Amino acid sequence: QTLDRLLGGGGQVFFANSGAEANECAMKLARRWAGRGRHVVVSTYGSFHGRTMATLAATGQPAKHGPFAPMPDGYRHVAWADLAHLESAIDETVSAVIIEPIQGEGGVHPADPEYLAGIRRLCDERNLLMILDEVQTGLGRTGEWFGFQHADVAPDVVTMAKALGNGVPISACWAKAEVAAAFQPGDHATTFGGNPLCTAAARATLEVMEDEDVPGKARHAGALLRGALEELRGV
């Protein structure tokens, strides 16, 4: 309920154990929602979505693919911040676009609000899911609860992990209720996801984050750092 509220409401949450599992859930949901024949997920070069075979295939870093090739089919990569390239990659086989609000492993590249809005527009026009991978950026780290909240967009699916359990292994995949309804009984499950220990840790973590206004503190720290950097010659 807390996560759904922080994401604007109207969604459902599936708990897992790691960011990769949350992204696997999101991409399986996209295929189930879109139906047979629409199995391709588009991501960007420089992205990082996990180390399982599917999330590694979605990761847009060919050097990471080499030792484990061939990669599973169904993943397509486009240039970062290039809406024209993204549009050209969308055909009748695509079900979703997965994007990080800030690329971490790709070199710390923030997505401009206009870029995220453009992705939302393309997803609406082509009937695709917009998946936000907030594993690294979520839960206050960017000055908002989630990185996409710096832009005027409403994703269909949001994944998160890392900060959620404050060191305890828990992740979550949030989806709009009408999207989550695509999963049928038996489609997706986990043995340890959502167990009492980890969810209690996540609930306590979120309570502290809200009580101490972690997003506000991140905004303040970011402003101090930006101000100091701007005083340096040549920066």
Short names for language-model regions:
Residues 1-235:
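Conserved N-terminal phosphate-binding loop of PLP-dependent enzymes in the Aspartate aminotransferase
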